């Protein structure tokens, strides 16, 4: 598991108050982890802050529905930032 994955899982577990064992790549924020729409928006903002990211555009953030989606988005944008440096 990548360092990004571990940090994302830790943050989601803490913010949504769920056991880390429940935070799987397939876990849907709403259906599996009990997040409502406000929780999801706050979680996206926390991830942006944690990973020093620019705000995620709304059309892209609504596509982030699972833990795996969040990790993939962060990893791809972290790689883009690294290649621009």
From Swiss-Prot:
Post-translational modification: 4'-phosphopantetheine is transferred from CoA to a specific serine of apo-ACP by AcpS. This modification is essential for activity because fatty acids are bound in thioester linkage to the sulfhydryl of the prosthetic group.
Transmembrane region(s): none
GO molecular function terms attached to this record: acyl binding; acyl carrier activity
Cell compartments where the protein resides: Cytoplasm
Alphabetized UniProt keyword annotations: Cytoplasm, Fatty acid biosynthesis, Fatty acid metabolism, Lipid biosynthesis, Lipid metabolism, Phosphopantetheine, Phosphoprotein
Pathway: Lipid metabolism; fatty acid biosynthesis
Taxonomy, superkingdom: Bacteria
Described function: Carrier of the growing fatty acid chain in fatty acid biosynthesis.
Name of the molecule in the record: Acyl carrier protein
Gene: acpP
